[in-house]
Amino acid sequence: LAFQVQADPIQNTDEETKTEEQPGEDDQAVSVSFGDPEGSSLQEESLRDLVCYCRKRGCKRREHMNGTCRKGHLMYTLCCR
């Protein structure tokens, strides 16, 4: 299963900032929603729990490539865990 998304950066909460790796210029955290054309969201638990990043240089350990994402005219790898 692969996805293509258009990404906008999201803000980390203070709790996430303390426990998660900080994204640099090469890594941008994104919010990803999954749904069908009628607009109802997918309820499959494995999709709801995904945390995804748009990365310039490939996925990190414990992440899997799930497609691509675009910010403006730049293409990134969509890495999810």
Curated annotation (Swiss-Prot):
One of its GO terms (biological process) is defense response to bacterium. Residues 1-7 form the signal peptide. PROSITE patterns: DEFENSIN. GO terms for cellular component: extracellular space. Disulfide bonds join C52-C80, C54-C69, C59-C79. It is found in: Secreted. Residues 1-44 are annotated as: Disordered. Keywords: Antibiotic, Antimicrobial, Defensin, Disulfide bond, Secreted, Signal. Residues 8-46 form a propeptide. Paneth cells of the small bowel. InterPro entries: Alpha-defensin, Alpha-defensin_C, Alpha-defensin_N, Beta/alpha-defensin_C. Probably contributes to the antimicrobial barrier function of the small bowel mucosa. Belongs to the alpha-defensin family. This is Alpha-defensin 8. The gene is Defa8.
